[in-house]
From Swiss-Prot:
Record's protein name: Small ribosomal subunit protein bS16
Gene designation per UniProt: rpsP
PANTHER family linked: 30S RIBOSOMAL PROTEIN S16, SMALL RIBOSOMAL SUBUNIT PROTEIN BS16M
CC annotations in GO: cytoplasm; small ribosomal subunit
Any GO MF annotation of the entry: structural constituent of ribosome
InterPro entries: Ribosomal_bS16, Ribosomal_bS16_dom_sf
GO BP annotations, alphabetical order: translation
Family: Belongs to the bacterial ribosomal protein bS16 family.
Source organism of the structure: Paraburkholderia phymatum (strain DSM 17167 / CIP 108236 / LMG 21445 / STM815)
Keyword list, A-Z: Ribonucleoprotein, Ribosomal protein
Domain of life: Bacteria
The UniProt record lists the keyword Nucleotidyltransferase: no
Length: 84
């Protein structure tokens, strides 16, 4: 089963997450199928969240599940998008 979840990057105490479509059996930071976006929780200026909505819609259309954290981030991105 394909799942869309966060893969951690960055250095110690400076997290950076890629939003990736991956097989549910692969490790958190392991092999993935496609990078769909990113989330930078420590960003002070600039964008902290970017999601390719078209690719996210595609993966959901073929049966991919979202992790709870990615669901929360997608809702946050959709709220911010109409304001922009």
């Amino acid at each position: 089963m394909v799942i869309i979840r966060l893969a951690r990057g960055g250095s110690k105490k400076r997290p950076f997450y890629n939003i990736v479509a991956t097989d549910s059996r692969s490790r958190r930071d392991g092999r993935f199928i496609e990078r769909v976006g990113f989330y930078n929780p420590v960003a002070t200026k600039g964008e902290s969240l970017r999601i390719a909505q078209d690719r996210l819609t595609y993966w959901q259309g073929v049966g991919a599940q979202l992790s709870p954290t990615v669901q929360r981030l997608v809702k946050e991105a959709q709220k911010a998008q109409p304001a922009a």
